[in-house]
Regions:
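Contiguous segments within soluble domain cores/interaction surfaces
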Residues: 27-141
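Signals and flexible motifs at protein termini associated with secretion
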Residues: 6-8, 23-27
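Bacterial N-terminal signal peptides
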Residues: 11-23
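Bacterial N-terminal signal peptides that target proteins for export
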Residues: 2-14
Length: 141
């Protein structure tokens, strides 16, 4: 029963994010067709829309994050994707590798959540000689 509730919560969260992504700041960050976002982080005119691959994160299994970065011209550059657990004051045991795919799209591979709880994704972005750190939370069961 608890597993079913977790799946329902994740599906509801994804639907809310999809509606928010589709309606808020659509001109600032257009999501290509077929890209079903898991989350979004915004700060000072920079937006990162991302999805996890696979969409459902399994504890103890590696996963990837595909991110789209939008913002002022020239396009901001994503320099790092990481995650940590603020309540536990620790991060992942693995360092993901980040690769640029062009047109503001990036893929980080090798992420792994080893325990349930609230995780915070961190995106470091450089634009106009300035570094900005964007973050957003995700509950993992």
């Amino acid at each position: 029963m608890e597993e079913r509730r977790g799946a329902v919560r994740r599906a509801l969260s994804a639907a809310i994010v999809a509606v928010a992504v589709g309606s808020a700041g659509a001109e600032a960050c257009e999501v290509p067709g077929g890209f079903a976002p898991t989350g979004r982080a915004e700060s000072a005119g920079i937006t990162v829309v991302f999805r996890t691959l696979p969409p459902a994160i399994e504890l103890g299994r590696h996963f990837a994050v595909e991110a789209l970065v939008c913002g002022a011209d020239p396009l901001p550059v994503l320099t790092r994707i990481d995650a940590h657990m603020p309540e536990h004051r620790h991060g992942m045991n693995y360092r993901p590798t980040l690769s640029a795919k062009g047109d503001g799209r990036y893929v980080a591979e090798g992420l792994l959540f080893h325990m349930p709880g609230r995780w915070e994704f961190v995106f470091d972005v450089e634009a106009g000689g300035r570094r900005t750190r964007l973050a957003t939370d995700m509950d993992v069961e």
